[in-house]
């Protein structure tokens, strides 16, 4: 990643939750501060590293975006651990290549879930701590199923706790989590938003 002119600082997620320091859960947080008072926004890429569009979109913000007011936080590898492996039995590549005007660039292709080296074994049934919802055991390593996280929870829950701490401490006004879907997936081209934010989410379609 080549930070663009809009990037004013780079911190690690462990800045907000020190227990992540030195682990595969720690990850870069790029800060783009306009210097003008305004709202703050967090963009997450790489929640599922086998969905490269979300990651690449976050990288483009880091390299090209220059906010006119307020502050933008971008985490391109939200689940950094999942970038260190691929999904078994899926014949997934470890990297992919993009031709650019400055030559070929390559990017890591990862897994949908935290590397089992960092968190194992999976339970038969995963009970989401905050809601009590029961899910498939493999979902225990899915970053999107671990919010708001816990300090005494799984490795994945500790990552989401760090992200939640960032949101709380920096008083983030809005968070966008970037994903990708295959063409045959039933929710392709979908935006999932809280009922209080549906109007704002609809604006992203235009």
PLM segments and residue spans:
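Short glycine- and acidic-rich boundary segments immediately preceding or forming the N-terminal edge
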Residues: 1-29
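Short beta-strand-to-loop junctions in surface cap/lid or active-site-entrance loops
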Residues: 27-37
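Glycine-rich His-Gly loop
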Residues: 34, 45-49, 180
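Short beta-strand element of the alpha/beta-hydrolase
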Residues: 39-48, 176
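Di-metal (Zn2+ and/or Mg2+/Mn2+) metal-binding site signature of metallo-dependent hydrolases
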Residues: 48-56
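Active-site/substrate-binding loop(s) of hydrolase catalytic cores
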Residues: 52-53, 68-206
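A short, Lys/Arg-enriched amphipathic alpha-helix followed by its capping loop at the start of a domain
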Residues: 57-70
């Amino acid at each position: 990643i080549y930070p663009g002119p809009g990037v004013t600082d780079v911190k690690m997620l462990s800045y907000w939750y020190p227990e992540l320091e030195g682990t595969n859960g720690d990850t870069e947080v790029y800060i783009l501060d306009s210097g003008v008072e305004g709202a703050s926004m967090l963009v997450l890429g790489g929640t599922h590293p086998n969905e490269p569009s979300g990651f690449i979109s976050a990288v483009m913000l880091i390299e090209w975006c220059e906010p006119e007011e307020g502050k933008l936080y971008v985490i391109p590898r939200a689940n950094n651990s999942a970038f260190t492996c691929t999904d078994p039995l899926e014949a997934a590549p470890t990297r992919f290549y993009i031709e650019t005007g400055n030559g070929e660039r390559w990017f890591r292709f990862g897994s949908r879930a935290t590397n089992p080296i960092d968190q194992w074994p999976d339970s038969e049934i995963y009970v989401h701590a905050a809601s009590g919802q029961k899910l498939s055991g493999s979902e225990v390593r899915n970053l999107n199923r671990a919010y708001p996280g816990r300090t005494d929870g799984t490795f994945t829950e500790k990552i989401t706790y760090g992200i939640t701490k960032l949101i709380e401490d920096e008083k983030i006004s809005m968070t966008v989590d970037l994903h990708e879907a295959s063409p045959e997936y039933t929710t392709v081209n979908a935006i999932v938003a809280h009922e209080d934010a549906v109007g704002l989410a609809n604006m992203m379609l235009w």
